[in-house]
Amino acid sequence: MMIPLHLLRSLEPVTGVCGRSLSYAGARVPAKTQNIINGQWVDSSTDRWIDVHNPATNEVVTQVPQTTQAEMEQAVESAKGAFRSWSKTSAMARQQIMFRYQQLIKSNIGELAKLITLEQGKTLADAEGDVMRGLQVVEHCCSNTNLLIGETMTGVSKDMDLPAFRTPLGVCAGIAPFNFPAMIPLWMFPMATICGNTYIMKPSERYQLVDSDANKCYLATS
């Protein structure tokens, strides 16, 4: 089954829990980020890159591609293709994926918070709060299947019943701001995908690492 997540800007995969082996003091990160399109890590063909700095040392911790129009359109087409199967996946099956995602985020809050501190400069306590507030929405998504059930009102008029159906919208997209790099993306794509939509996520170009690892966890749930 294809996971309906297509990140326009993300981090190349490395080993470890959720795809990373990280120590806070000397975090090893790649020189350039990659895109995720159709569930695959893809190098950008752009020749324009944005440096992401550690605010404590001014060290460049990664470079973010200014993703091309063609790459964006490729992500859209991929999301359209994934929607055909994902929208027909049962709500219970989508719920099981969200349960696994919730557990992976919860188990790696500390590591995700370190990435926020590395690239944004928040204290670890603030960074953990950033992740935790996003996790709360993911936990809500786990119970959202009860809200996806249609309903039927009988006898609304003579010989008339009124059924209601809840169906996915299609391909959705979100652009995340810089100030809460974990929390706000976790407000966006989990809610859309649990409802059967596919999603194109564009995280802030200033803070890539935590979004990348959070979405590695999502890809790992398949």
What are these regions (language model features)?
Residues 45, 72, 109, 127, ...:
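Alpha-helix N-cap/helix-start motif
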Residues 2-63, 96, 150-175:
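Terminal low-complexity tails and localization/encapsulation signals of metabolic enzymes
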Residues 33, 57, 89, 117, ...:
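Ser/Thr-centric signal marking residues that sit
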Residues 47, 91, 117, 128-129, ...:
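Proline- and acidic/polar-enriched loop/turn elements at helix boundaries
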Residues 41, 83-86, 178, 187:
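Signature tryptophan residues that serve as conserved aromatic anchors
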Residues 59-149, 159:
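Glycine-rich loop-to-alpha-helix module at the N-terminal edge of alpha/beta enzyme cores
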Residues 150-222:
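Rossmann-like NAD(P) dinucleotide-binding subdomain of oxidoreductase/dehydrogenase enzymes
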